[in-house]
Amino acid sequence: MSFKSQLLILAQKLSKGGISCELIEFDECILKLEWHTELLDKNDSLLYEQEEDDILSLMNPMITMHAWIRDSPSFEVPQFFFQPYANGSDPLTKMEQIFELLEGSSQNLAYDALAIGDCPGTVGIAWYIHPCRTRDYFEMLQIDKEDPKYLSLWLLYIHQVLSPLTQPIIKAVDDAEKS
């Protein structure tokens, strides 16, 4: 099954779960995603403050996630680019801001996997999970790129790195596969 076919199937699953999806075809196929998530702190408080030095002090903002999925031609694995926005409009551009959003176990994985750079789905930069880490994950799984569950398994890795930010896409895929 081609990567484009897998992206189209993934887009159907995500759309059913309320994730906005758009297939963009430049020189390559890129699936653009958007979703919203509200993060709770350990006390379920609803606090959001922005410090003077612009480092996010964050308990429970509404986070809007923009993401792009493409096939990395160099590493031959899917690549996940993303840009979170606090309360709909404030882009989170500092590593400290991203780490404040992640669960403890995800922070450890994210430390080695996250980078920021040019995003092929936009004219700007975005965060991304480095494809060499993704390649290591697939080598451990020993799964073929043609396997119909390839992208679903890859999303589980993305979720390990970015939990709880990616919970809505995991739920959408899980719900679609159960129905």
Swiss-Prot record:
Transport among keywords: yes
Active site: C132
Keyword Acetylation: no
Enzyme Commission designation: 2.3.2.-
Any single Gene Ontology cellular-component annotation: cytosol
Keywords: Autophagy, Cytoplasm, Membrane, Nucleus, Protein transport, Transferase, Transport, Ubl conjugation pathway
GO BP: autophagosome assembly; macroautophagy; mitophagy; protein modification by small protein conjugation; protein transport
Recorded GO MF terms: Atg12 conjugating enzyme activity
Pfam families recorded: Autophagy_act_C (PF03987)
Topology class, membrane: Peripheral membrane protein
Matching InterPro entries: Atg3/Atg10
Compartment(s) where it occurs, according to its Swiss-Prot or TrEMBL record: Cytoplasm; Nucleus; Preautophagosomal structure membrane
Subunit composition and interactions: Forms homooligomers. Interacts with ATG7 and ATG12.
Role of this protein: E2-like enzyme required for the cytoplasm to vacuole transport (Cvt), autophagy and nucleophagy. Acts as an E2-like enzyme that catalyzes the conjugation of ATG12 to ATG5. ATG12 conjugation to ATG5 is required for proper localization of ATG8 to the preautophagosomal structure (PAS). Likely serves as an ATG5-recognition molecule.
Family: Belongs to the ATG10 family.
Protein name: Ubiquitin-like-conjugating enzyme ATG10
Taxonomic lineage from the root: Eukaryota, Fungi, Dikarya, Ascomycota, Taphrinomycotina
